Regions:
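C-terminal, non-catalytic interaction/recognition modules in large multi-subunit enzymes and RNPs
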Residues: 1-73, 80, 85-310
Length: 310
């Protein structure tokens, strides 16, 4: 993938990791040429094919968390992360018919940053298979209290005060006879309509509901989270150089592409694609037909727009 993006000019060999690592484009071209000759295609065709295959796999993963769960991707904004996320976000959004995307600040190290900032959490589950109509509110409370007691004891070993722990309750439910469950949030004021919430969730996920079939409780679930004070840290702010332009070759065409540092983009300034937006921990390939702005949170907001053919 890196070789393919490098050969297509979407990654600058001299700007990888903010210039801290130089990529060998000649070796990348040689590797692609070897395979391209066996497949009887050009180097650029192979590079585009590699990226297309990879993006199709990414689309499958996005389908699994959207369409397959009853959500229309077009109703959402695509958020990407990772060093290569910005290289593919425009194409992925187009494949999902999405009109906007967000590349968070420090997106290239977002996972690592998230691990450092994430709140400590414990998940507890107790299996208790019974028809929902046959268990009382008092019995559910007893089950949750048992899990909360167990969880609190574990968290106290980390010297956490009870007042800093947030509790979230939920139930794994299914229609009687099913082998899979849906997790439904639970609170005291939901005890009378929990079955209705399950029917609605089943409708959203699978397109139908079985209101005449008994709803069965399978698991009682508890999530305990240690509340911690969050801060807005800035990881990478160094500007490498001013905006420049260069001509990069895409399959069968040449386009003048703006190359600039993300940190040099002013809040509210509009960048029109095609453009390459560089930063120390990632690269963004802004395709033709897309524009980008930095918002008040220093996130890069991408929007799809109509291309005027001259």
């Amino acid at each position: 993938m890196t070789d393919a993006n490098l050969v297509l000019g979407r990654i600058r060999a001299d700007a990888f990791l903010g210039g801290g690592m130089s990529l060998d484009i000649a070796s990348a071209e040689s590797a692609l040429d070897t395979l391209a000759s066996k497949l009887q295609m050009s180097r650029l065709q192979l590079a585009e094919g590699i990226i297309e295959l990879a993006e199709q796999q990414m689309v499958k993963a996005l389908h699994a968390i959207s369409i397959q769960k009853g959500h229309n991707p077009n109703d959402f904004t695509l958020c990407c992360f990772g060093g290569a996320g910005g290289l593919h976000v425009c194409s992925l959004a187009e494949k999902l018919n999405m009109k906007s995307a967000i590349i968070p600040q420090n997106s290239g190290v977002l996972s690592a940053y998230g691990m450092l900032k994430a709140q400590k959490q414990r998940q507890f589950t107790k299996t208790h298979i019974i028809q929902l109509d046959d268990i009382s509110h008092h019995q559910l409370e007893q089950l949750f209290e048992g899990l909360e007691s167990q969880g609190t004891k574990e968290l106290k070993l980390e010297q956490v005060g009870r007042q800093t722990i947030r509790s979230e309750r939920s139930l794994d439910l299914r229609y009687q006879g099913q082998s899979f469950t849906l997790n439904i949030p639970f609170s005291a004021d939901q005890t009378r309509n929990i079955a209705d919430l399950f029917h609605h969730s089943h409708q959203q996920h699978y397109g139908h509901q079985l209101t005449n079939t008994a709803v069965e409780l399978v698991n009682v679930c508890l999530s305990l989270t240690i509340e911690t004070q969050q801060s807005n840290d800035v990881i990478c702010t160094e500007v490498q150089n001013d905006a420049t332009t260069q001509v990069i070759q895409l399959p069968s065409i040449e386009k003048e592409v703006t190359i600039l540092q993300r940190e040099a983009i002013k809040e509210g300034e509009t960048i029109i694609g095609p453009a390459i937006i560089l930063e120390k921990v990632s690269t963004t390939w802004l395709k033709e037909g897309w524009c980008a702005k930095i918002d008040q949170f220093q996130h890069l907001v991408l929007k799809k727009h109509e291309v005027i053919v001259q």
